[in-house]
Amino acid sequence: MMSVLVKEVIEKLRLDIVYGEPELLEKEINTADITRPGLEMTGYFDYYTPERIQLLGMKEWSYLISMPSNSRYEVLKKMFLPETPAVIVARGLVVPEEMLKAARECKIAILTSRAATSRLSGELSSYLDSRLAERTSVHGVLMDIYGMGVLIQGDSGIGKSETGLELVKRGHRLVADDRVDIFAKDEITLWGEPAEILKHLIEIRGVGIIDVMSLYGASAVKDSSQVQLAVYLENYDTHKTFDRLGNNAEELEVSGVAIPRIRIPVKTGRNISVVIEAAAMNYRAKEMGFDATRLFDERLTSLIARNEVQNA
């Protein structure tokens, strides 16, 4: 099971530590769900989920402050259980002394942020969703081409890494080579990242392992990217029919999310990196409503209609 440490959340969201011994910052977070305790403050703890991060905004804080000191302390002691990873107070609100006392007794980190509660909740959920999502490892090269994530796949030795290197030289960015870890960020979005050991590295047969960041600079690499298009490279076969109009819809499904995939035949004399660039731009054009295949079809239909009229 994937997990995130409390200290990683602190670093990512730039939270301030009000109370937190070093060992408390090593606590694991195993769920991306967040709880904003409301009914719990009235003493209703049925269906309470203590394993989640507890986030307090202005409403929760105001109600808490309105309570008598002893009642405030008793409620907080019931909320703060050993499995609770941390408590975050938003908007830079002052943490009441009773909360600090309960946190010390129950060994729970108290954190604060100046961000608005809704914004903080969104950022926290997004970060935890991406970190805790199940990864699927696929073989290929993930490139950022014109701001679009393109997954290049194909048989071993077909030239995926060499194509990736050529794309880097043409100003695009390497995300991952050889192994791409992909996860579903939501129901319609795939995201890809490199394995930590392979980050910024690319392997070229006959040359060895190349550190792309060292050779080409920080602008040539990217730590992660949305995966929007898959390109499959395969050896050219005269007996096989390849799509020439772009109207054969094919998909690659990963983690229950499907993305379009195109097949590109590889043979001597073809500049594959340029072809992939064109494929990426063509996909983006389709997303914007410009479909060259449809335009060709309309022109062809119009030409046939005119010829039929002339020959009538």
UniProtKB/Swiss-Prot annotation:
It comes from Streptococcus pneumoniae serotype 4 (strain ATCC BAA-334 / TIGR4). The keyword Transmembrane helix does not apply. Belongs to the HPrK/P family. ATP binds at G154, D155, S156, G157, I158, G159, K160, S161. The keyword Transmembrane does not apply. NCBIfam families: hpr-ser. This is HPr kinase/phosphorylase. SUPFAM superfamilies: HprK N-terminal domain-like, PEP carboxykinase-like. Catalyzes the ATP- as well as the pyrophosphate-dependent phosphorylation of a specific serine residue in HPr, a phosphocarrier protein of the phosphoenolpyruvate-dependent sugar phosphotransferase system (PTS). HprK/P also catalyzes the pyrophosphate-producing, inorganic phosphate-dependent dephosphorylation (phosphorolysis) of seryl-phosphorylated HPr (P-Ser-HPr). Residues 202-211 are annotated as: Important for the catalytic mechanism of both phosphorylation and dephosphorylation. Homohexamer. Residues 265-270 are annotated as: Important for the catalytic mechanism of dephosphorylation. Its cofactor is Mg(2+). The active site is at H139, K160, D178, R244. Its EC number is 2.7.11.-, 2.7.4.-. Mg(2+) binds at S161, E203. The gene is hprK. Both phosphorylation and phosphorolysis are carried out by the same active site and suggest a common mechanism for both reactions. Keywords: ATP-binding, Carbohydrate metabolism, Kinase, Magnesium, Metal-binding, Multifunctional enzyme, Nucleotide-binding, Serine/threonine-protein kinase, Transferase. The Walker A ATP-binding motif also binds Pi and PPi. It catalyses: [HPr protein]-L-serine + ATP = [HPr protein]-O-phospho-L-serine + ADP + H(+); [HPr protein]-O-phospho-L-serine + phosphate + H(+) = [HPr protein]-L-serine + diphosphate. One of its GO terms (biological process) is regulation of carbohydrate metabolic process. It is an enzyme of class 2 (transferase). The lineage of its organism: Bacteria, Bacillati, Bacillota, Bacilli, Lactobacillales. Gene3D superfamilies: HprK N-terminal domain-like (3.40.1390.20), P-loop containing nucleotide triphosphate hydrolases (3.40.50.300). GO terms for molecular function: ATP binding; magnesium ion binding; phosphorelay sensor kinase activity; protein serine/threonine kinase activity; protein serine/threonine/tyrosine kinase activity.
